[in-house]
């Protein structure tokens, strides 16, 4: 998971949100007014600021393996529009509360799937995350990865968010093996360098990933983490 820098609210959404406030619509009813061209504009705005990566698992969205009848991109409400405590803070059309996410490993449109096989917001549903918020970088600082592609965290609340609520290590989803494959490719490229050349390669690669805007490299979170950890080891060994 990587930090998301929210951009400006699309004017089309602002207009709709103000009307919803005037009509005192519930978060769900307010969101139901977002449709057609307006919804497409909001979706595209979210995709661009996230570099076409899922806010939670970092896969490319839309994925190219989504079954017919399944929405390849979902608009997620960080604070659910139907929260378990029924709170209403205008979250239905609050742009700061909206994220673009993948289909969450939903295999078919007939709902013939197991809950434990789902990921991201499809598994999160209306549950509040304890701490993780991709729009607040400080909440992501304890995250680390394993070379087999699994995501983890030193902070137990963050780990619960990642592993239990978002199910980002789901064995039935391709995301773990895809994270592992992305890291393996990076390590293979690093094997061509040694000493100062390796340090320079890692620094250049790290900056390249961090500077990406739209169409970011899928699963770059594990790549950035690995490059930082290797650079830390290499620079410490030289002191």
Descriptions of predicted regions:
Residues 3-8, 15-20, 32-33, 40, ...:
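Catalytic cores of phosphodiester-bond-cleaving enzymes
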Residues 55-56, 74, 100-101, 142-145, ...:
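A structural signal for short, well-ordered beta-strand segments and their strand-loop junctions
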Residues 50, 60-71, 165, 175-178, ...:
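Hydrophobic N-terminal alpha-helices or hydrophobic patches in metabolic proteins across all domains
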Residues 112-172:
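Long, low-complexity, intrinsically disordered segments enriched in glycines and aromatic residues
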Residues 60-121:
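Histidine-centered nuclease catalytic patch
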Residues 57, 105, 139:
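Short Cys/His-rich metal-coordination motifs, predominantly Zn2+-binding knuckles/fingers
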Residues 156-239:
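C-terminal, charged low-complexity interaction regions
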Residues 3-56, 84, 89-93:
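Short, charged surface segments at domain edges that flank catalytic/cofactor-binding sites
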